[in-house]
């Protein structure tokens, strides 16, 4: 499961050939959450409120990139890094 971005201690990961709907995983400390890409929203898991708001902000900024990486992952192609939240 490649890490496609990391910021403020939050790791953003995407699995190869993962189930629909298009989504990514985020880890922070001992917490993990799964975020749908379009529309952006929590599929499952729990995150501290501040960390969740940062992940949502990042996902909104890079939604197109996330969909491109989801397509690459679904086709077992090498994933590209997405810039962190600044």
Regions found by a protein language model. Give the residues of each.
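Basic nucleic-acid-binding interfaces
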Residues: 1-86
């Amino acid at each position: 499961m490649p890490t496609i971005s990391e910021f403020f201690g939050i790791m953003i990961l995407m699995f190869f050939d993962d189930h629909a709907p298009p989504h990514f995983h985020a880890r922070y400390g001992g917490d993990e959450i799964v975020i749908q890409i379009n529309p952006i929203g929590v599929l499952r898991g729990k995150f501290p409120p501040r960390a969740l708001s940062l992940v949502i902000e990042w996902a909104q900024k890079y939604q197109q990139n996330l969909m491109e990486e989801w397509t690459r992952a679904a086709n077992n192609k090498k994933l590209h890094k997405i810039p962190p939240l600044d």
